Amino acid sequence: MANRSTFLSAGVFTREFDLSFLPEVIPAVGAAVIGPTVRGPALVPTPVSTYSEYLRWFGDVFSSGSGASEKEYKYLTTYAVQEYLRWGEVITVVRILAGQYRPAYSFVRSKAGKDANSYAQNQMSFKITALSDGEITNSGRTTAALSGSGKTTDESTQGSLVSGSRYNMRWEVANVDNNRGTFDLYIRRGDDSDFRKIIMEQYVGVTLDPNASNYITKVIGNQTYALRYDSGGTPYLQLTGSYPNRSRFIRVDVIKNTLNYINNDGTVRDGDLSGSLPAAFSASVPTAFSGTFAFGSDGSVAHPRAMYGDIWNNNSQGFNLAVSTYSTPYLDAIDILSNKDQYDYDLLLTPGLIDNLQDHAKVITRAISMVEDRGDAFYIIDPTYKGSTVGQAQIAAEGRNTNYAGYYYPWVQIVDADLGGNYWVPPSAIVPSVYSFNDLVAEKWYAPAGLNRGGLDQAIQTERLMTQNDRDNLYIKNINPIATFPRTGVVVWGQKTLQKKKSALDRINVRRLLIAAKRHVANTAKYLVFEQNTIETRTKFINITTPWFENARK
């Protein structure tokens, strides 16, 4: 074939350049929600793409109260996630806990310390810590308190835990091999029994030798995020630990290593190293033994929790926002989500925060400032507590002026099949489904409202049946009514932002159009950063961005 890199005779030659190339497809952008959950890591933004994945990480139903007053509930966070993920692709969950919260943990005794009554670390082989913070993962009163039978003192005679539940867990060690320095570790569900084990994870043939490929910390992981503050008081997450977590439930820290346990010829290098292995019992005692998790704490969460329509200034799902101990976690979560490089979302939700409750409003103000500073997210706010009038909603709206947030009124009643009843929830717990449905069937610059895209099919009824005059009075103050119409049901009937000045940006679809446009330009142009400022680079940028804007114009 002729070489066409040089041309000796006259002629017209063409050369082709692909100026539309992008290395990867831009990932989906979803919502972010801040609020309490049943379990999960606290203050660590965690993306989930399905509701079942959310349940695995954060749970759903919990009980509060005691005796005849004990009831089962769901946090409003759960409803918001469930509604958004009906049509949406991903939502980032930030769990809130207050005060000195901590995860449950357990020590596994070493062979040398199995008969000791002490919990000194020199008696322990390794420590297992739950990835989930809070007391929900406590399955016993102590950790690895062994009785003479190799069972924990928290077990019944049938091998089930007195405090076992589907939300907590227990561990079991089996098949300790002194010749190889290996053992098996099983993570079991807290409500199983020795006769009907529910094994959630199993790690076979792990070792305490840090040079081995099956070193237990390498296999399971030991990383966690610690909340830190910089010199200016801004919170950030500091990663600790050397090995990524492969377990969905635990992390492991080895206390007694067995360095180079096996020689090259397959023999045990030092017989004393076997004393570091998990305790093995005599022939008259089972070779498998188990333990429970304890000492997990929810911190300063108030009991009983005020739920649903009982939410008030000093108790919103167990959080008294009049006290800094409770408000600070919300503020920390908001500040953490301000990191645009790390967390990508275009819709912010804080179900449980009510704007006409004084101390809630302070937190909401911080959240508004955060989305305005980011410039790429819209914030759904609940203006009033249950039972508030149209006039009270109007008063709340007078104190806000932003095109990065919107109000919806009134509260809505939904059916909860898991709890077997009807419950009142604020708009931010159900309206997210309208946004995700709108984005699925249309585009972000379409109005998330009306009979075609604004239906709330999960809703039974609204707290108040509004007249045309009520809707007009709300809309004048930039509050989006949730209306009820015969034969059509409950519908979002407005799409205004909280901007007071009349302009195109007092409409939610226009604000979301600009958010989407800025995100598209930013995500595509970053591949051209540090490229030469040439006509080819500029042409590439135009070719990348123009089709998106042409589509938005249609």
Enumerate the language-model features and the residues they cover.
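Short, cationic low-complexity segments
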Residues: 204-219
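Structured, hydrophobic secondary-structure cores that serve as assembly/anchoring elements
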Residues: 1-125, 129-138, 176-184, 188-194, ...
